[in-house]
Each structure stands twice: as structure tokens, then as C-alpha cells.
Amino acid sequence: MPKSRIMLDVLKGEAHFPPPLWMMRQAGRYLPEYRETRRRAGSFLDLCYDPDLAVEVTLQPIERFGFDASILFSDILVVPHALGRDVRFEEGRGPLLTPISVAEIMALESDVFHVNLEPVYETVRRLRAKLPDETTLIGFCGAPWTVATYMIAGHGTPDQAPARLFAYREPAAFQHLLKVLADHSAAYLIRQIEAGADVVQIFDSWSGVLDDASFDQFCVWPVAEIVRQVQAVHPDVPIIGFPKGAGARYRTYRQKTGVTGLGIDWTVPLAAAKDLQRSGAVQGNLDPLRLVAGGKALSDGVEAILKALGDGPLIFNLGHGITPETPIAHVEAMVKQVRSAAR
């Protein structure tokens, strides 16, 4: 059975051992070939919007490590950028946006949204043509809450206090922003699927900073709306949700959003992850710093996950993205350990 079918079967709730394997941010700065392509591209957004270069960097980790899945190289902030918002990336500072006002939120719309994102769709089409048949292609978007935090503050913050405060002070405007982002993100994922994505993932990197009521309003509801809209058009395409930092609310998130697979961060106890497997596939959850450290810290972490979760529906991954300082040899060691694992 081709490995692409194995990953899709895992997302249907089946167990396979060894599990399929890929890494968040697997096309990134830890790879010298990525750094060279990034240098040639100019700006980060130029790299995202150039299909030739975006395909090149997406394929680099597949060619080097043979991962079971390839994730489109892009960024969650192309959605606000395609909606006409100013987005730029500065070395050492990350993403910078012009903070959005209440009036701008209420007028937020673009009749050229898909035109602006056509280079991304072209990248997906080319990837599906170039990838090995056994490699699953993953499309993605950012969750409305996480994208909104950057649009409100204009940059990342430690606890996203600007967005939380804005949401409390301007609830109607904030809910409108989440609805606009949910609708456009769903349309974006649908186009990625139609271009060739086998699976899509929704990244909610800042879900862990919210209280219970806000988590339900700002994280769960918008993602549930995306899932509803995507499944109305493509009911058989799996959707992975990754609400990083959700803690005890992972179960509620899965139940209320309807996601197919659940990405879990490294803080989730393996006993809790095992319990989550009872309702479907989980993806994760190696601490990225174990991969940086290597040696026994790495092998013990991999072994613990495989032992606890390997007999259920598991997609082996990190609990967040790989960091730039990660040695390539450590990635090779992780891949070898997962692939050679025996029950």
C-alpha cells in the first residue's frame, strides 16, 4: 500500500506502524539549500509567491529525508495580504503589519483575493505533479484567531494582549473580523484542494492564551465554520486542526470543530494523547528542543511517543515547528528511529 494511502488511512482512524512522518516547518532555515534559495528570492513574500522557488523549497526536505508528507511552502499571513493588508517580513523581527482599525475591519473585503493567491494555487498544482505518488500533499491556512492577533497588534506579542483587549472592547468588530477571515480561509483551502492538496491543516498557534469563553468564541467557532464550509464542498478531504497550547481543551476543540485529525503540542501528556486517539488520529508531539539536543534526549522522546501512541492512529511529528539551529544529523537520526521501529 502506498504511504500516501497509509497517511490518509491514519486520518480515517486506522493504526499503522511505523507511523507516517513529517515535520512542521520542514522546509526551513535549518537546511542550507533553503537558505540559498531564500537568498535568491529576495523577500520572504517573494519566495511564497514565486511558484518556481516555492516548489523548490517545498521539495527540498522530501528529497533529503523522504518524508511521508509534503506541506506547501507559504505563510499564514498571505490571507490578510491577499485581502489588501500591508504585510512584510523583516530579518530578526518576523512579520510586521499595519494594525487594522475598527473602520477598516468593517470594510475588509477584496474582489481580487483569489487573483492575489493564484501563485500559491499554481505552486500546489506543480507540487502535486512533481511529488512522488506516495507522498501526501498538505495545504494549510492560519486559524482566524491567530491571524487576527497579528492584524490587530501589527506583530507577534508574547501573550497576544493587544488582540485580547481589542476583542473585549470591540466585540462586534472582532467577531466580524473572525467571520471575514473564516470565510476567506475556507475559500483558500477549497482552492488548494482543487489544485491538488490531499489534506489541509489549520494552524492556531495562539489558542493557548485564551480563557474558556474566549477559546470557544475565538478559536472553536471560526475553525468549525471553516470545517463546515470546506466539507460542504470536499467532504472526503481530511482536515487537521492544531490549536497549540489548548491543554485540557483539545477534546472540546475536536468535538466542536469537527476536524479529522488533531495536532498536539509537546506539553500534552502522552496518557492524555492516548485518550485523544480514541476519537481519531493525533499528530505530534515531539518537543522540538529534543530534536535540537539529539542523543539520548531525542531517542527517549521518540521511543516514548511510539510506545504510547504507536498502536493507535498516529502521524509522527514535532509538537511545533523545527527550529533553525537543529542539526540535520539529528533529523536523520529521528527519521531512522521512527522508520526502523518495531513493536
Curated annotation (Swiss-Prot):
GO terms for cellular component: cytosol. Keywords: Cytoplasm, Decarboxylase, Lyase, Porphyrin biosynthesis. InterPro entries: UROD/MetE-like_sf, Uroporphyrinogen_deCO2ase_HemE, Uroporphyrinogen_deCOase. Its EC number is 4.1.1.37. GO terms for molecular function: uroporphyrinogen decarboxylase activity. Its main location: cytoplasm. The record marks D75 as: Transition state stabilizer. The keyword Cytoplasm applies. It catalyses: uroporphyrinogen III + 4 H(+) = coproporphyrinogen III + 4 CO2. Belongs to the uroporphyrinogen decarboxylase family. Catalyzes the decarboxylation of four acetate groups of uroporphyrinogen-III to yield coproporphyrinogen-III. Homodimer. This is Uroporphyrinogen decarboxylase. It comes from Mesorhizobium japonicum (strain LMG 29417 / CECT 9101 / MAFF 303099) (Mesorhizobium loti (strain MAFF 303099)).
